[in-house]
A protein has these predicted regions:
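Intrinsically disordered, low-complexity terminal regions
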Residues: 1-279
Length: 279
């Protein structure tokens, strides 16, 4: 079990073809890496774990598990567990593997072809998930996410959120910066702290509470719903070609110079548009 003295945050890279990756960030002055066979009784797993390399140089720890082609039966699999200092930057490339992190990480990049991804806390995050569910508690910087088949849930993004999705639903909690999202599935936002631009082909769009700026929501076949806080004036431009537009906001005199305002530009083809006060 390699152990390295790392009194400050490090840079970690992990490349795992099959298995699982667990990374724990705590206030510590060393980094510990453990690579074990997923099944200690399976010779292929044992052999693959023995061939893994762990290299430490220039404050960077690189963990690499070789890729092996399996023509018959399940492929060889390993588990990678890493304990490192808080604030470390992490890059994970996982083909068929689950990825889980705890503690506060620095700038992070996670690529997963098949498998669930669970991240507790990162600085900026670049995520690419093809197949599998993704859960992120907090991104303290910007979020750049590309998803394929699988649900994405991010509880909080302090910065901007840029998302490209295919078929899975997307759920965002509170986002402090600009939101720019394109997907074929549904997308929901609990609270948007800045401008919003969301487009969906088939899934419902819901922004429960806006904070101002310009909100552009476009859909083709499902509902568009947006909530405006009490006391905020809204400029509304909404149209649905083959469904209803329901504006539950009451008409009021124009806003004063110091009033909070939001500009809503909403479009739909076959789904309703609903505008209401945020609850």
């Amino acid at each position: 079990m390699p152990t390295f003295e790392t009194p400050t945050a490090i840079i970690l890279t992990v490349d795992v073809p099959m298995g699982y990756v667990e990374i724990a960030a705590t206030d510590r002055n060393d980094t510990v890496v453990e690579v074990t066979p997923s099944n200690p009784k399976r010779s292929g797993d044992v052999q693959l774990a023995s061939e893994a390399t762990v290299i430490f140089t220039d404050n960077t720890v690189a963990v690499r598990v070789p890729k092996k082609l399996s023509l018959f039966g399940p492929g060889d699999s390993v588990g990678v567990r890493i304990a490192l200092p808080t604030g470390s930057a992490v890059t994970v490339d996982a083909a068929y593997a689950t990825v889980r992190t705890t503690g506060e990480l620095g700038e992070s990049r996670v690529t997963s072809a098949y498998g669930a991804v669970t991240l507790q806390h990162t600085a900026s995050l670049t995520l690419n998930s093809a197949h599998g569910e993704v859960d992120v508690h907090r991104v303290a910087g910007d979020l750049d996410a590309t998803t394929g088949h699988g649900r994405l849930r991010v509880d909080r993004v302090d910065g901007e959120a840029r998302i490209k999705g295919s078929y899975g639903d997307i759920g965002l909690g509170e986002v402090g910066g600009v939101i720019d999202a394109r997907t074929s599935g549904g997308i929901s936002v609990d609270r948007a702290g800045s401008d919003v631009s969301i487009r969906s082909a088939h899934g419902a769009i819901q922004v429960r509470e806006v904070s101002g700026g310009t909100v552009r929501l476009e859909n083709a076949n499902a509902r568009v719903q947006v909530g405006v806080p009490a006391g905020m004036a809204a400029w509304v431009d909404a149209a649905s070609q083959h469904a209803a537009v329901r504006n539950e906001l009451t008409a009021e005199p124009g806003p004063r110079a110091d009033d909070r305002t939001v500009e809503l530009r909403l479009r739909n083809n076959y789904g309703d548009i609903i505008i209401h006060r945020a609850i």
